[in-house]
């Protein structure tokens, strides 16, 4: 139980808060001023609520320093931190209000890479990545049901070992690509049936999860980013119906509307385009509805 704080001490602490707030009074950008003063108020409120010790302050500074050291062109520890604290999903929720039947957005994640290879409709994004084949198909429409042709559909995912291509030490490009929707808004491609995997947990964010008894596991998912002129950019996933991690995804990214049925197909079942597959495979339909910009 914390020791009561005297009125005199509270006044000294509040005086400091007011002085820091006034230091931003001359900020020319009104939005920057609003953000910095709000950040100051909430940060000091947190410090005073928990009565942070100097040792804990040093630990926090060390944590942020470690997050900076581990961040590079292949790994973004600060995005992971934002994700596991729910800040990413909260920001997405605030900036992507529901618009009719538009597909819901979810977290971007730290593993998107610009310049993915293009495939034609019916192509394969796997690029040699290990995993059970999965046929993905659907349409891209607007909220009035009209097809959206030539929408750019970026897709990426982890392989069967739970790693994205950028987590390997070589320069491979695998399990990521982009394609365009057809004149009728249709699209289709081969991918890998998603499986659960842990977010990188060998750094400071992983240590925080371990210290708080939280799992680093993500529910099975496939990433999408869909762009088209005059439409709101959509960043989303589809999740696998029946996955036991749906209710405890480590980054709070699951939304009911994004949980889809991945229908298992036995070995020897006819495949779209006549592709030869030795073992079982799956198929899923994901119809995408884009909100206006």
UniProtKB/Swiss-Prot annotation:
Its EC number is 1.13.11.37. Optimum temperature is 50-55 degrees Celsius. GO terms for molecular function: 4-hydroxycatechol 1,2-dioxygenase activity; catechol 1,2-dioxygenase activity; ferric iron binding. Inhibited by 3,5-dichlorocatechol, chlorohydroquinone and 4,5-dibromocatechol. Homodimer. Binds 1 Fe(3+) ion per subunit. Keywords: Aromatic hydrocarbons catabolism, Dioxygenase, Iron, Metal-binding, Oxidoreductase. Optimum pH is 7.5. GO terms for biological process: beta-ketoadipate pathway; catechol-containing compound metabolic process. Disulfide bonds: none annotated. Gene3D superfamilies: Aromatic compound dioxygenase (2.60.130.10). It comes from the Bacteria. Pfam families: Dioxygenase_C, Dioxygenase_N. Pathway: Aromatic compound metabolism; beta-ketoadipate pathway; 3-oxoadipate from 3,4-dihydroxybenzoate: step 2/4. It catalyses: benzene-1,2,4-triol + O2 = maleylacetate + 2 H(+). Its cofactor is Fe(3+). InterPro entries: 1_2-HQD/HQD, Catechol_dOase_N, Intradiol_dOase_C, Intradiol_dOase_core, Intradiol_RC_Dioxygenase. Catalyzes the ortho-cleavage of the aromatic ring of hydroxyquinol. It comes from Nocardioides simplex (Arthrobacter simplex). This is Hydroxyquinol 1,2-dioxygenase. Fe cation binds at residues 164, 197, 221, 223. Belongs to the intradiol ring-cleavage dioxygenase family.
């Amino acid at each position: 139980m914390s020791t009561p704080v005297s009125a005199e001490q509270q006044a000294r602490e509040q005086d400091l808060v007011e002085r820091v707030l006034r230091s931003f009074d001359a900020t020319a950008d009104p939005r920057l001023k609003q953000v910095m003063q709000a950040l100051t108020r909430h940060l000091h409120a947190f410090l005073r609520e928990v009565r942070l010790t100097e040792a804990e302050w040093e630990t926090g500074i060390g944590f942020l320093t470690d997050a900076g050291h581990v961040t590079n062109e292949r790994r973004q520890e600060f995005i992971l931190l934002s994700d596991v604290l729910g800040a990413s999903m909260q920001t997405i929720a605030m900036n992507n209000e529901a618009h009719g039947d538009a597909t819901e957005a979810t977290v971007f994640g730290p593993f998107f890479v610009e310049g993915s290879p293009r495939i034609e409709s019916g192509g394969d994004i796997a690029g040699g990545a290990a995993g059970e084949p999965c046929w993905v198909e659907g349409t891209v429409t607007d909220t009035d049901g009209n097809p959206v042709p030539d929408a750019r559909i970026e897709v990426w995912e982890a392989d069967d070992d739970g790693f994205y291509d950028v987590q390997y030490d070589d320069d491979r490009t695998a399990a990521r690509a982009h394609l365009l929707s057809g004149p009728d808004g249709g699209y289709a491609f081969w991918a890998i049936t998603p499986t659960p995997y842990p977010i990188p947990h060998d750094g400071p964010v992983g240590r925080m999860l371990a210290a708080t008894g939280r799992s680093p596991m993500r529910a099975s998912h496939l990433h999408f980013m869909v762009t088209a002129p005059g439409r709101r950019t959509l960043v989303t996933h589809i999740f696998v119906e029946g996955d036991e991690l749906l209710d405890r995804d480590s980054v709070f990214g699951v939304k009911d509307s994004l949980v889809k049925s991945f229908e298992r197909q036995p070995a020897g079942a006819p495949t779209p385009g006549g592709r030869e597959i030795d073992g079982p495979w799956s198929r899923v339909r994901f119809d995408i509805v884009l909100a206006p910009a």
